[in-house]
Swiss-Prot record:
Gene from which this protein is expressed: infB
Chain residue ranges for the region called Disordered: 1-400, 464-483
Region of interest (G5), residue spans: 632-634
GO molecular function terms attached to this record: GTP binding; GTPase activity; translation initiation factor activity
Compartment(s): Cytoplasm
Stored NCBIfam families: IF-2 (TIGR00487), small_GTP (TIGR00231)
Biological function: One of the essential components for the initiation of protein synthesis. Protects formylmethionyl-tRNA from spontaneous hydrolysis and promotes its binding to the 30S ribosomal subunits. Also involved in the hydrolysis of GTP during the formation of the 70S ribosomal complex.
Chief subcellular location: cytoplasm
All residue ranges annotated as the tr-type G domain in the record: 486-656
UniProt family annotation: Belongs to the TRAFAC class translation factor GTPase superfamily. Classic translation factor GTPase family. IF-2 subfamily.
Compositional bias per record (Basic residues), positions renumbered to this chain: 383-392
Any one Pfam family match given in the protein's UniProt record, by short name: IF2_assoc
Start-end of Low complexity biased regions: 74-92, 181-209, 225-270, 302-325
Official protein name in the record: Translation initiation factor IF-2
Amino acid sequence: MSDTNNPGDKTQTRAPSKPLTLKRPVEQGTVRQSFSHGRSKSVVVETVKRRTIGAAPGTVAPREPVAAPPPRPASVAPAPAAPARPAGRSASGVVLRTLSEQERDARAAALADAQRREAEARARAEAEVKARRDREEAERREREAAEARRREEEERRRQEDELRRKAAEDSRRRAEEEAARAAAAAPVDEAPAEAPAAPAPVAEAAPTVAPTPAPAPRPAPAPARPAAAAPAARPGAAPQRPAASGARPGVAGARPAPTAARPAAPQAPAEPRRTITADVKKPRDLNFMARPAPAPEPEKAPSPTTAARPAGTAARPAARPGAAAAEDESDTKRVIRRPGMPLKIITPPKTPKSPGGDRNRGRLTIANATAGEDERTRSVASFRRRQQRMSGHRHEEPKEKIARDVTIPETITIQELANRMSERAVDVIRLLMKQGQIHKITDVIDSDTAQLIAEEMGHTVRRVAESDVEEGLTSDEPDLEEDLEPRPPVVTIMGHVDHGKTSLLDAIRRANVVEGEAGGITQHIGAYQVAAPSGDLITFIDTPGHAAFTSMRARGAKVTDIVVIVVAADDGVMPQTIEAIQHAKAAGVPMIIAINKIDKADANPQRVRTELLQHDIQVESMGGETLEFEVSAKTGDGLPELLEGLQLQAEIMNLRANEKRDGEGTVIEAQLDRGRGPVATVLVQRGTLFTGDIIVAGAEWGRIRALIDDTGKHIPYAGPSVPVEVLGFNGTPDAGDRVIVVPNEARAREVTEYRARIKRERLNARTGGANRSLVDMMREAKEGANRKELPIIIKGDVQGSVEAINGALTALGNDEVGVRILLSGVGGITESDITLANASKAVVIGFNVRAHKEARNAAERDGTEIRYYSIIYDLVDDIKATLSGMLPPTLREERLGEAQILQIFDVSKVGKIAGCRVMEGVVQRGAHVRLLRNDVVIHEGKLAQLKRLKDDAKEVTAGYECGMSFQNYQDMRVGDFIECFNVEEIKRTL
């Protein structure tokens, strides 16, 4: 919108797009502001001289400020031409009344906006406090509180919508009233002023200003203002132009002469201060802080300057573009009128707010400090501190409880339990203290206690066991009938030592294993396959018969199908024979009795049958069901019949297996070979083992590198009932471990790590590991103070032999002496073994193994003893003799005689000497003596001197008198008896 000026018009013309600039006398200075944390900033301060503006003529009712209405045009009648301007201008001819009124309106609107924004900020803060209280209440009733917040939000929105709607109605009504007043006040150059209208009602729910009277029509312009009352001319303003010759009738010539005196207009009453509520307050923007804001003035009808404007000149708009830009977007619509055009209501364009427009609303300037409109608003630093405090309160808000699914193993530490629940460990310890338990965060609790704690804290518990890693490792599903095929029987030969078990097996295999065994006794468990006369294969397992190999015999009975009990015809049933019978009964396998050595002259097979009846074994020849065969390993008599009986028993048992499934078996024996590494003798029981399979045996795993049968040949696979040597384990497994094929290495590592951990825990529990309390250690130290121990390190050739040695040596000893095995393993003696033995003063025992060169050198340097054995008998006997030498001897007293004290003599440099008479027996010098007083032992020691008269005597017999003195004792009295005796030491044995 632009102004069209006639040649006679001297008013200022401005483009709407240019901002309003005022050239004032300005003084500048600097002020240093201090902020928190030692920060400061220099600020340029402008000092502007305050301009005094005279009061407007006429009595005008104050304007009623309302909320910003939505744009809505109003239809009004066109306004007549403005009357001629009176002579009320300044010496420079600049019109200032309209400009100052617009400026005051803009500043009043800016103040209202600032107060409204500040009120909204306070309302938001109050809403945040209320929301925080609601969240605290929502800990117990979360759903109800959430529903309440939702209803509250809906109510607040509804109220805001209602406020906006009513504010829009008020604004529309006000705009219509202003338009009507503007239309009525156009031809008022000589019309009398109308009475003020009644006050307009205020909307019910609108939180706006207090009710004020509605504006009345402006009165007729006054004749003239005094020259002294004219405000200073605005710099840069154009002089007022004279009226054009083509003015409308009644308008031209209506302007009085500039020098004509005009009666002074009545002074306008002071505008009542508007009461700004919380909803209309907003922070001040930059336009307000740039210059001092005048007090808001009441609205007026079109000024005489505008009314008296000559015809042909477009009427000045009611709101200048520069002033409109300074007003908030909530201002009411403007009413403008152009010559020859209908009256229009124009809504000023909305100025978009910049993101940081309100950032500097609290900056201190001279103009801001001297304005006096309102108290100084909050600074940026203060606002930031308030935001930080609010954010800190939000951080202190209690977090909502989150129920989690907690997985609890069999044992768990308090710290780990707290981490899984996302709780504090101190809270867990506090709950345990309520239950009467005192713990640290590193203590281990059981699964029941952990479940109780987790449920107490509102979590869901899912209990698992560490052994779950072994689930699915073996399949218990029965095999299909079409997959089952006959397999060879597994026969275990058991019996007493030297009853001919290995010789019998050699005769069947046509081999000579006995000569290869040290001492002619079996110290390893062996597995072989033999072809029966019918051509079928039979798998034999040879077990030791020595008492130390009980565990070997038990393993052999568990993996077998048939047990052959070998009994010598000349010895009969012996202790290990009875033990073998018990193992077979415990395993639930059928037994066959082989009566060996029938070729001897003193053989008595019938005595063997009779002795077996004492152990509930009735052979067929005596009406029972147990098969018995008389055989001779030396001559080979009865061996074919024995093999036929084994084949018949296998057919009765209908032994079948599935070769198509993954292989499973049992470790019969294991050893550490220096060239091949860990080697395990495995008996395959189900499925088939292939080269390259990943297998797990106890706490060891590996990939099969090679399969070797009993004849030493490499085979690609091994089926059911086939004994093979397996190479490829990463460690030596224990004899009796289950061998299982797993799909991948990850699964193998998972299983073996769990088993190794369980193995360590059991070892610590058995030897007293880290879980022992101080009381336990003190009790054990007290109990073991008088017990002597022999530390030993054992290295053997195979796992079974080492196990047998451990069992035999552990059984030795009593409460006074015993064996403490520091280390036992398979393989040669290494330098680390010597180092351990030197540190603990232990003896190193090698069973069928030798020490490495480095180990020998270290043993010679440190003086460590290494003993080599190949027969378990010799090893056990030597250790037993060593323990016997550690036993304290038995003391036995031999009474010599008795004497009575008759007189006490004091001898210088000697002390007291007792004059005695030997009552019975003999008293010897250097013998042990015991002083008795009233049949109570007063002292026990040794005789220091023995004299007969004045000569030293070796002994004094009964009836003679002598003098005696004791070692380190002088309290002797007349009438005491002295008993003389000798102490004899007797060597003890285990």
